[in-house]
């Protein structure tokens, strides 16, 4: 398996994000379908011949999936430690498939829909921990951030596709309108479960389990280098020594992730993922219909498609920001800009969108849509993908699965709070809710400045060293620059030594060949002399390299 194919497969694991986006992106449209409402809504208006949901029923149908995600995120750790990330991803993909099957066959009980959404949440929550963690362990550090960011790209892409599917199926007769959406979601789960079987296991997990030869082979395939390569040997020995040091303390217990050396990172990961949701990105998708109606638009499915397209298109900006602007700056300035967007959105919505006589100001609605789109652009280039990157690369291997579970549970806790409580709060204060989100974004900006350290381009082992040091978060970029400078210098020195040693070997070969010709030896014996003379030299060169005390070059 060459490097390109393996890289494609590592990106393919972001299909886990596709499952999340497909499920969350389809439910709002499905709830608005006439046939679905007639079967599962709890309110009927005979005058208008229409169905609707009570606040409690709507909160349960939209919010309980996040409760399932919270449970699934915590459940992923014991599975990872027992069977590894690869087969854990396969297992929880199966859980998601079963959940979608329950949803497809949910007639006429709304309780079955509720159970199906909770079970789907368990699968999605576990996959949201496993997939970014797997990608962080397998991807090279130079592109690790971009690879993990593809999780968010897949998620937003799936939400757009789901909105388009809903728009195309909502006019179908009877149950086909919503069963089609659930059925297609089930196909995505099958695709992931089958595809993951072709992925290599994480080398760090294999070394952790004592399967060194298998780990070394996978590392060689990923880098397209031989096992004797200094880069491979250095990386392998670094990972192995770090694992041995970490495992010297025995199997990590849950209480240890709140111990002195690790609780800072545990809390940081949890807070980043919690505020990733509390800053209000999903609010726009839940209440886009109201805003778009203010502009005169009546199609309830079109707003989801428009916002989904913006959400998906702008997420590609994260591929640039993550590995060029780093981790801290996009989060700090992104949240500050989002605070401004929400403040203007709330002010216009509260004062201008709806008049007392019930009419709406189309210009006010247009302004709100513009700032909704600006918010989504900023979010998709910063907080959207960056949370998964931080969770994937911040924790040491001994605690990684447990810390990632706790951190990701913050994401689903925040999502649950938004989806469950927003209907009640919005009914009470309307667009003033935007002021609250503006304050949360501003707080998030300061939180990142004082807590998160810059980790752009660092290996997972260097990230661990950084957080174990006393370097202040706002000074951590200096550490990153020093590491990058040292790495570039080492690479140039290594290339220079390789050229010099290669010249020396060629000179020896020519000398031996000339001596062999003078002695009138046959071609076969001459060849044997050259090989026997060169091989020890290559071995000596290799040994000399590993004796040097120099900073490693990482793949």
Curated annotation (Swiss-Prot):
Ranges of biased composition (kind: Acidic residues): 510-521
Transmembrane region(s): 10-30, 59-79, 88-108, 113-133, 145-165, 180-200, 267-285, 302-322, 329-349, 364-384, 405-425, 433-453
Cytoplasmic-side segments: 1-9, 80-87, 134-144, 201-266, 323-328, 385-404, 454-555
Pfam families documented for this protein: Sugar_tr (PF00083)
Membrane topology: Multi-pass membrane protein
Region annotation Disordered: where it falls in the sequence: 492-555
Biased composition (Low complexity): 522-534
Glycan-linked positions: 357
Keywords associated with the record: Glycoprotein, Membrane, Repeat, Sugar transport, Transmembrane, Transmembrane helix, Transport
CDD domains (alphabetical): MFS_HXT
Biased composition (Basic and acidic residues): 492-509, 545-555
BP terms from Gene Ontology: carbohydrate transport; gluconate import across plasma membrane
Family membership: Belongs to the major facilitator superfamily. Sugar transporter (TC 2.A.1.1) family.
NCBIfam families: SP
Name of the protein in its database record: High-affinity gluconate transporter ght3
Species annotation: Schizosaccharomyces pombe (strain 972 / ATCC 24843) (Fission yeast)
